[in-house]
């Protein structure tokens, strides 16, 4: 049994600096086809992928994201929940389907479908020798992204992905993940607080040491401190409103 895929995904890290070398149309097509091969709930295929190589559109999205690698990459993908095609089917159906795709369950199905597709693309790209970085920052201004990409009703932007050849001086590395026993629960969830606290304390030390070594002492924060800072930041609180404006989560 080969460990090729295991070793590939274990060394994954986000790449934020790329060579100025566009992906070929053939590579883009192969990546999208790999994404389409992902599992999809009830064969709904409730997603679409928007491929972007137009420099002005990239620049407009960079203004939303605030990150230079939205422009400086080999290719940019944006992944969206897409029930527009299902809405078109609904126009000629005998049964009202909007109760389904406009529901909270419909949102979950579309988001999961898109995430599975994106991960297929990410792993395939890395197997080809490319680097990738996911871009949740496109949700900083959903209304603006919908305008830039001309998204119709029932289509919602989830995240982007920049892909390209890593720059020569790109020096990213895989970050230590939570301990195996902290994320894998056998048969039922183990919620013992003392065990959870002990495992998180150990992990905090691991992450602090990782940053200390990576930055020559310039960063030493723990994982818990990162989580407090991120989740304590009251950002993107308009998400429910934006989802509903898109025709999603109506019930």
Swiss-Prot record:
CDD domains: NfsA-like
UniProt keywords, alphabetically: Flavoprotein, FMN, NADP, Oxidoreductase
GO molecular function terms attached to this record: oxidoreductase activity
CC cofactor: FMN
Coiled coil (UniProt feature): none
Pfam families hit by this protein: Nitroreductase (PF00881)
Enzyme class: oxidoreductase
Enzyme Commission code(s) on record: 1.6.-.-
Family: Belongs to the flavin oxidoreductase frp family.
NCBIfam families named in the record: PRK10765.1
Role according to the record: Reduces FMN, organic nitro compounds and disulfide DTNB. Involved in maintenance of the cellular redox state and the disulfide stress response.
Protein name: NADPH-dependent oxidoreductase
Organism: Staphylococcus aureus (strain MRSA252)
Encoding gene, per UniProt annotation: nfrA
């Amino acid at each position: 049994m080969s460990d090729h895929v295991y070793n590939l995904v274990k060394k994954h890290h986000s790449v934020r600096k790329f060579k100025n070398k566009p992906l070929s149309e053939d590579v883009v097509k192969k990546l999208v086809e790999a994404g389409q091969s992902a599992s999809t709930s009830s064969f709904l295929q409730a997603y679409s992928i928007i491929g972007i190589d137009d420099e002005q559109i990239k620049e407009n999205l960079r203004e939303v994201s605030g990150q230079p690698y939205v422009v400086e990459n080999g290719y940019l993908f944006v992944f969206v929940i897409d029930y527009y095609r299902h809405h078109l089917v609904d126009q000629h159906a005998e049964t009202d389907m909007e109760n389904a795709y406009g529901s909270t369950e419909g949102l979950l199905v579309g988001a999961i479908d898109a995430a599975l597709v994106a991960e297929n693309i990410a792993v395939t790209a890395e197997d080809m020798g490319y680097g990738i970085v996911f871009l949740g920052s496109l949700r900083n201004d959903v209304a603006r992204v919908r305008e830039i990409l001309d998204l119709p009703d029932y289509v919602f932007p989830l995240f982007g992905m920049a892909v390209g050849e890593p720059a020569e001086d790109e020096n990213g590395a895989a970050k230590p993940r939570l301990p195996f026993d902290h994320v894998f629960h056998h048969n039922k969830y183990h919620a013992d607080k003392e065990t959870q606290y002990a495992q998180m304390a150990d992990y905090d030390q691991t992450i602090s040491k990782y940053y200390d070594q990576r930055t020559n002492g310039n960063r030493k924060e723990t994982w818990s401190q990162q989580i407090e800072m991120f989740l304590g930041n009251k950002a993107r609180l308009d998400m429910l409103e934006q989802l509903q404006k898109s025709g999603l989560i109506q019930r």
